[in-house]
Amino acid sequence: MAVGGNNWSMWLRMSRVHLRQITKSLDRTLISLSHGNFSHQYNRNIFVTWWKSLFEASTAFRRASGLTVSPLTRRGIARFDHFRPVPNVSKFASFPRVPKGAPRGLFTNWNMTTSKRLLGQRAYSTSSIKFTQEAVNNMTISLRCFFNSLGGLNQCSHSNSCKAYQNASNVTSKQDHVQPVALKKLSQKDINFIRNLELFKIMKTQNEVVDETSAYYMEKPGSYIEFTISEFNVNGTFSAPLSFLDPSLLADLDEMIRNYKYELKSIYSSVDMILQNYGSLPITFHRNKIRIHFPNSTVVETEKLIAGLNIATGVIYADTSPDISLEGTNLNALVNVDNSGSVWSFVKEPSFPSRSAFSPILSDASYDTYELV
């Protein structure tokens, strides 16, 4: 019997060792499959925690029946049911029920509805509703404090809300002529009425109906981009009217010339880029300004076209000059009257047959030599 007892204890000891090794291997497998999603306190005993939860005492307790005779029942002490397993208790039940893909740690008020089909989960957040209610409550409290600071409404005219609001506004102006009356704090009904009345006044006085069919709001096609060539002025750099030649003065003059050339080259490159992308558009010159016209585009559309070329040196305006690009009309050419460059006039010329005076926007570069004289 002694030998049998020793063998039995040894078998139990070996069984415990093997069970411990099996649980460790199961823990490592679960951790590798979960990619470290378990909390640190369960990283080493996941399987043991789940196994113990099947046999832990449930929170529900009951009194022993009257037929059972025990010291506990005689004393009226409740006992726990140690052998009743708790249903659906697992490690995953302790995780927060947050839907897959939801931002963790941002919202805590997730309402979950577990579906019985395929154990699917649905979630919706009440954060926006909660914040809206808080904003309404803050507005209500601020309005209540504001009107309470004025002394409240007239109690004598409280039956009529409109008269109450009028009397409350006239109390301060007629205090010297009217005997004091009993005032009370604003009720929720008064606050709602005043709030609705103020909103109604705002809606009546600060509304604006935009008539999109009006010619004022309809933008007509026709715009141009204007490049301004700055004047080469040396007075801004050399303040003294009289100076003497020296290397530093020549270096400053050379830098001014190089900067002026760079500005001219940037304008030329912008104009050349418009020609290469949008074709033979109308161009006019006036003193130190170069204007490239877009007859078929509004200001907004022209801004988009110019922004697509990364051009930032010109200014776009609406074109209010006579339309010279309509087919079937006479071509109006700009002619310098006094050869001074300051006075220009329009001269009618016969229109070209079967084509417009200028190529449309977004067309290929034309090889015809039609230009403004």
Swiss-Prot record:
One of its GO terms (molecular function) is proteasome binding. Signal peptide: none annotated. Induction: During stationary phase. InterPro entries: Stationary_phase_5 (IPR038816). It comes from the Eukaryota. One of its GO terms (biological process) is proteasome assembly. Required for survival at high temperature during stationary phase. This is Stationary phase protein 5.
